[in-house]
């Protein structure tokens, strides 16, 4: 069973390419293990929120910014690995 990863991003802000880039990187890192879905908000929210198995692990609104550095990406990878370990 694939692990749910949900990204809510500001659609009105044009963040969809950032979501698609993150999705591609995560699919490369965890081939066949993740069910990644993205939702763009129609209004300006500034959101780029990443939830793994129902737990918020990255939030632009809380000061994390975008997932635009290797350290931020590694933080997500660590959270996903921990969630996958709990599923086994």
Curated annotation (Swiss-Prot):
Cross-link (Cysteinyl-selenocysteine (Cys-Sec)): 10-13
Tissue expr: In the embryo, expressed in the developing nervous system and in mesoderm-derived tissues such as heart and limbs. In the adult, predominantly expressed in brain, skeletal muscle and heart.
Gene Ontology cellular component list: cytoplasm; plasma membrane
Induction per the UniProt record: Down-regulated by hydrogen peroxide. Increased levels are detected after treatment with L-buthionine sulfoxide (BSO) before exposure to hydrogen peroxide.
Annotated function: Plays a role as a glutathione (GSH)-dependent antioxidant. May be involved in a redox-related process. May play a role in the myopathies of selenium deficiency.
UniProt keyword terms in alphabetical order: Antioxidant, Cytoplasm, Glutathionylation, Redox-active center, Selenocysteine
Quaternary context: Interacts with DPYSL2, PRDX1, YWHAB, YWHAG, HSP70 and HSP90.
Key word Metal-binding present: no
Similarity comment: family membership: Belongs to the SelWTH family. Selenoprotein W subfamily.
Record bears the keyword Oxidoreductase: no
GO biological process: erythrocyte differentiation; response to lipopolysaccharide; response to stress
Highest rank taxon of the organism: Eukaryota
Molecular function terms from GO: antioxidant activity; oxidoreductase activity
Principal localisation: cytoplasm
Effect of residue 13 to S: Impairs protection against hydrogen peroxide-induced toxicity
Compartments where found: Cytoplasm
NCBIfam families according to UniProt: CXXU_selWTH
Species annotation: Mus musculus
Result for mutant: residue 37 to S: Impairs protection against hydrogen peroxide-induced toxicity
Modified residues (S-glutathionyl cysteine): 37
Name of protein: Selenoprotein W
Lineage of source species: Eukaryota, Metazoa, Chordata, Craniata, Vertebrata
